[in-house]
A protein has these predicted regions:
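Short N-terminal secondary-structure initiator segments
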Residues: 66, 70-73, 128-146
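Secondary-structure boundary/capping signal
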Residues: 39, 50, 131, 142, ...
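Distinct, well-ordered alpha-helical segments
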Residues: 88-89, 111-118, 174-179
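Conserved radical SAM core fold
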Residues: 81-83, 107-114, 124-140, 166-170, ...
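Conserved C-terminal portion of the radical SAM core fold
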Residues: 30, 69-75, 95-102, 121-122, ...
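Conserved non-cysteine loop/helix-boundary elements of the Radical SAM core domain that shape
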Residues: 47-58, 79-85, 134-150, 168-179
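Conserved alpha-helical substructure of the radical SAM core
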Residues: 2-113
Length: 199
């Protein structure tokens, strides 16, 4: 996010504090419960799920309502959002409302979908450490797919960051150090998440 967008976002928080007019500044939308991966720690049963997603019109109407309420940032997640054929339309609609739009992805479908998603303000790619640790958590070949996605995003001037779920497996194998080194080398941001127990 650019400095000016951050400044504008901070201004909205200050305005809400002064006016006491609260609204959801940031909203995460789970646009699908389907996923093409079966990560070992995932709490959802998303893998190869054969269910219908809410239709495009549902999301566009919801985005209209969020815009009217004053929402400034919409974060698209899943499952794997790129399994939706209309993801480009949803992104364009959010951006057309002047809102910031971010998305999470496992990276598999990014190269094939880059034209639909390059208007995003940022793309967050799942990456859990070096190839061995990552693929142990996410499945064979996922590390290379994630790196491909990061490189495609960078070539298309799409700000990208990695999202790492910290587990005993990858922490003991130097995941944090590997990700930070890779981020410096290639040039992307990184965030780290802890597993939490589902209740």
């Amino acid at each position: 996010m650019s400095f000016f967008k951050q400044l504008r976002f901070a201004g909205e928080i200050i305005r809400a504090n002064i006016t006491k007019h609260w609204f959801p500044l940031t909203v995460s939308l789970t646009v699908t419960n389907r996923c093409n991966l079966k990560c070992v720690y995932c709490y959802g049963s998303y893998f190869n799920r054969d269910i219908d997603d809410f239709p495009t019109e549902f999301w566009l109407k919801l985005i209209d309502k969020l815009h009217t309420m004053g929402t400034k940032l919409v974060h698209l997640e899943g499952g794997e959002p790129l399994l939706r054929k209309d993801i480009g339309k949803i992104i364009d609609y959010v951006k057309g409302k002047g809102m910031i739009c971010r998305m999470n992805s496992n990276g598999y479908l990014v190269p094939a979908s880059i034209q639909e998603i390059k208007r995003l303000d940022s793309l967050c790619i799942s990456l859990d450490g070096d190839e061995e640790s990552n693929d142990k958590n996410r499945g064979a070949g996922c590390y290379k797919k994630a790196l491909d996605a990061i490189m495609v995003a960078k070539r298309n001037h799409l700000p990208v960051l990695s999202s790492t779920v910290l587990t005993q497996n990858n922490v003991e194998n130097g995941a944090i150090e590997h990700i930070l080194s890779l981020a410096r080398e290639i040039g992307f941001g990184s965030q780290f998440n802890f597993l939490y127990e589902q209740t």
